[in-house]
């Protein structure tokens, strides 16, 4: 399937996503969802943070990613039985 401008970007999940900073709705064609239980996602999030730093992301964005990494780690430790693709 080829993505088109009139298609929802994330074909697996549905919902309404709001930006925390201003309460605006993020359009369906601008977001994707990854679950905390996904081991592949957990493994690449620190790499995403490194890439953001390399590309000049501001301190606020990097701090937000750091908080996300911390929350993800904590959730995964507390919910180990739910984690997918166990090594």
Residue ranges and their predicted role:
Residues 1-7, 79-87:
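Short intrinsically disordered terminal tails
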Residues 3-41:
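N-terminal acidic leader/helix
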Residues 31-80:
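Amphipathic alpha-helical packing elements
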């Amino acid at each position: 399937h080829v993505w088109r401008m009139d298609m929802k970007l994330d074909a697996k999940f549905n919902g309404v996503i709001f930006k925390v900073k201003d309460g605006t709705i993020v359009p369906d064609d601008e977001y994707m969802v990854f679950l905390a239980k996904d081991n592949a996602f957990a493994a690449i999030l620190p790499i995403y943070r490194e890439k953001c730093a390399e590309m000049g992301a501001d301190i606020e964005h990097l701090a937000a990613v750091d908080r996300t990494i911390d929350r993800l780690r904590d959730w995964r430790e507390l919910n180990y039985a739910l984690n997918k693709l166990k090594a």
